[in-house]
Amino acid sequence: MRIISGKFGGRRIVVPKNLPIRPTTNLAKESIFNIITNKSDLKNLKIADTFSGSGLIGLEFISRGSDVIFVEKNIKCFKHIVKTLKLLGLNNKVFKSDVFKYLQTSDQKFDYIFADPPYKFSYEQYLQLIKLIVNKNLKSDGLLIIEHFKKNDFSDISEFKERRDYGDCSFSFFK
Protein backbone atom coordinates (compact mmCIF):
# COMPACT_ATOMS: atom_id res chain seq x y z
CA MET A 1 0.00 0.00 0.00
CA ARG A 2 1.15 3.55 -0.57
CA ILE A 3 0.47 7.12 0.47
CA ILE A 4 -0.91 8.90 -2.58
CA SER A 5 -0.15 12.59 -2.15
CA GLY A 6 1.37 15.26 0.04
CA LYS A 7 4.51 15.23 2.16
CA PHE A 8 4.78 11.42 2.09
CA GLY A 9 3.27 10.98 -1.38
CA GLY A 10 4.52 7.85 -3.15
CA ARG A 11 5.83 6.33 0.09
CA ARG A 12 5.07 2.62 0.39
CA ILE A 13 3.75 1.38 3.71
CA VAL A 14 4.25 -2.31 4.45
CA VAL A 15 1.12 -3.77 6.03
CA PRO A 16 1.70 -7.11 7.78
CA LYS A 17 -0.40 -9.94 6.39
CA ASN A 18 -1.42 -11.07 9.88
CA LEU A 19 -3.44 -7.93 10.63
CA PRO A 20 -7.20 -8.59 10.81
CA ILE A 21 -8.03 -5.88 8.27
CA ARG A 22 -9.08 -5.24 4.70
CA PRO A 23 -7.07 -2.18 3.61
CA THR A 24 -8.80 0.38 1.42
CA THR A 25 -7.56 -0.05 -2.15
CA ASN A 26 -5.34 2.66 -3.59
CA LEU A 27 -7.97 3.39 -6.26
CA ALA A 28 -10.78 3.85 -3.72
CA LYS A 29 -8.53 5.90 -1.42
CA GLU A 30 -7.44 8.16 -4.27
CA SER A 31 -11.05 8.69 -5.38
CA ILE A 32 -12.24 9.51 -1.86
CA PHE A 33 -9.39 11.97 -1.28
CA ASN A 34 -10.19 13.67 -4.59
CA ILE A 35 -13.73 14.21 -3.28
CA ILE A 36 -12.50 15.41 0.12
CA THR A 37 -9.90 17.82 -1.27
CA ASN A 38 -12.51 19.31 -3.59
CA LYS A 39 -14.60 20.10 -0.48
CA SER A 40 -11.83 21.68 1.59
CA ASP A 41 -8.13 22.31 2.09
CA LEU A 42 -6.95 19.63 4.51
CA LYS A 43 -4.13 21.66 6.06
CA ASN A 44 -4.48 22.01 9.82
CA LEU A 45 -7.85 20.24 10.00
CA LYS A 46 -8.56 17.98 12.99
CA ILE A 47 -9.16 14.40 11.86
CA ALA A 48 -10.07 11.18 13.69
CA ASP A 49 -9.25 7.92 11.93
CA THR A 50 -11.44 5.42 13.79
CA PHE A 51 -11.36 1.65 13.42
CA SER A 52 -7.96 2.59 11.98
CA GLY A 53 -6.73 -0.86 10.99
CA SER A 54 -3.51 -0.24 9.05
CA GLY A 55 -3.70 3.52 9.67
CA LEU A 56 -3.33 4.29 5.96
CA ILE A 57 -6.31 6.66 5.79
CA GLY A 58 -4.98 8.69 8.71
CA LEU A 59 -1.50 8.70 7.17
CA GLU A 60 -2.97 10.07 3.94
CA PHE A 61 -4.59 12.92 5.91
CA ILE A 62 -1.30 13.58 7.75
CA SER A 63 0.60 13.65 4.46
CA ARG A 64 -1.79 16.37 3.28
CA GLY A 65 -1.24 18.54 6.37
CA SER A 66 -4.01 17.44 8.75
CA ASP A 67 -3.72 16.89 12.51
CA VAL A 68 -4.80 13.25 12.98
CA ILE A 69 -5.56 10.98 15.92
CA PHE A 70 -6.04 7.23 15.52
CA VAL A 71 -8.47 5.02 17.46
CA GLU A 72 -7.96 1.26 17.17
CA LYS A 73 -8.91 -1.56 19.54
CA ASN A 74 -6.89 -4.43 18.05
CA ILE A 75 -3.44 -4.68 19.66
CA LYS A 76 -1.68 -5.82 16.46
CA CYS A 77 -3.13 -2.93 14.46
CA PHE A 78 -2.39 -0.49 17.28
CA LYS A 79 1.27 -1.57 17.40
CA HIS A 80 1.55 -1.39 13.60
CA ILE A 81 0.23 2.20 13.56
CA VAL A 82 2.59 3.27 16.36
CA LYS A 83 5.55 1.63 14.55
CA THR A 84 4.64 3.24 11.21
CA LEU A 85 4.29 6.71 12.76
CA LYS A 86 7.69 6.29 14.42
CA LEU A 87 9.28 5.22 11.11
CA LEU A 88 7.90 8.38 9.50
CA GLY A 89 9.13 10.57 12.37
CA LEU A 90 5.59 11.45 13.47
CA ASN A 91 4.18 11.72 16.99
CA ASN A 92 0.42 11.65 16.39
CA LYS A 93 -1.69 10.18 19.18
CA VAL A 94 -2.88 6.59 18.84
CA PHE A 95 -5.56 5.43 21.26
CA LYS A 96 -5.95 1.71 21.93
CA SER A 97 -9.62 1.82 22.69
CA ASP A 98 -13.07 0.71 21.69
CA VAL A 99 -14.22 3.41 19.27
CA PHE A 100 -17.61 3.89 20.94
CA LYS A 101 -16.01 4.31 24.39
CA TYR A 102 -13.44 6.75 23.04
CA LEU A 103 -16.01 8.89 21.24
CA GLN A 104 -18.43 8.88 24.20
CA THR A 105 -15.74 10.15 26.57
CA SER A 106 -13.86 12.50 24.24
CA ASP A 107 -14.64 16.21 24.30
CA GLN A 108 -12.77 16.83 21.03
CA LYS A 109 -14.58 18.04 17.93
CA PHE A 110 -13.27 17.03 14.52
CA ASP A 111 -13.50 18.44 11.00
CA TYR A 112 -13.53 14.93 9.53
CA ILE A 113 -14.03 11.56 11.12
CA PHE A 114 -13.25 8.52 9.03
CA ALA A 115 -14.72 5.23 10.25
CA ASP A 116 -14.04 1.79 8.80
CA PRO A 117 -15.87 -0.55 11.18
CA PRO A 118 -15.96 -4.31 10.63
CA TYR A 119 -18.21 -5.30 7.72
CA LYS A 120 -20.15 -7.51 10.16
CA PHE A 121 -21.51 -4.40 11.92
CA SER A 122 -25.29 -4.45 12.17
CA TYR A 123 -27.45 -1.61 10.87
CA GLU A 124 -28.19 -0.68 14.50
CA GLN A 125 -24.46 -0.43 15.28
CA TYR A 126 -23.89 1.79 12.25
CA LEU A 127 -26.85 3.95 13.27
CA GLN A 128 -25.54 4.27 16.83
CA LEU A 129 -22.09 5.24 15.50
CA ILE A 130 -23.49 7.81 13.06
CA LYS A 131 -25.75 9.48 15.65
CA LEU A 132 -22.96 9.57 18.26
CA ILE A 133 -20.41 11.13 15.93
CA VAL A 134 -22.70 13.64 14.22
CA ASN A 135 -24.29 14.80 17.50
CA LYS A 136 -21.19 14.81 19.71
CA ASN A 137 -17.85 14.58 17.92
CA LEU A 138 -18.12 16.54 14.65
CA LYS A 139 -17.68 20.27 14.31
CA SER A 140 -20.82 21.99 12.98
CA ASP A 141 -19.40 21.99 9.44
CA GLY A 142 -17.67 18.61 9.87
CA LEU A 143 -18.11 15.45 7.84
CA LEU A 144 -18.28 11.77 8.81
CA ILE A 145 -17.12 9.27 6.19
CA ILE A 146 -17.92 5.60 6.71
CA GLU A 147 -16.38 2.84 4.64
CA HIS A 148 -18.71 -0.14 4.39
CA PHE A 149 -19.79 -3.13 2.34
CA LYS A 150 -21.71 -2.16 -0.79
CA LYS A 151 -24.91 -3.96 0.27
CA ASN A 152 -25.41 -1.56 3.21
CA ASP A 153 -27.74 1.35 2.51
CA PHE A 154 -27.87 4.33 4.85
CA SER A 155 -29.80 6.73 2.62
CA ASP A 156 -32.79 6.66 4.99
CA ILE A 157 -30.77 8.23 7.83
CA SER A 158 -31.42 11.97 8.14
CA GLU A 159 -27.70 12.82 8.43
CA PHE A 160 -26.89 10.99 5.16
CA LYS A 161 -25.52 13.23 2.38
CA GLU A 162 -24.04 11.05 -0.39
CA ARG A 163 -22.55 7.68 -1.26
CA ARG A 164 -19.75 6.54 -3.56
CA ASP A 165 -19.19 2.93 -4.65
CA TYR A 166 -15.88 1.31 -5.62
CA GLY A 167 -16.29 -2.40 -6.33
CA ASP A 168 -17.68 -4.11 -3.22
CA CYS A 169 -16.64 -1.15 -1.08
CA SER A 170 -18.76 1.95 -0.50
CA PHE A 171 -18.23 5.25 1.27
CA SER A 172 -21.17 7.09 2.80
CA PHE A 173 -20.95 10.72 3.90
CA PHE A 174 -22.88 12.18 6.85
CA LYS A 175 -23.25 15.69 8.29
Annotate the PLM regions:
Residues 1-175:
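Class I S-adenosyl-L-methionine-dependent methyltransferase catalytic core
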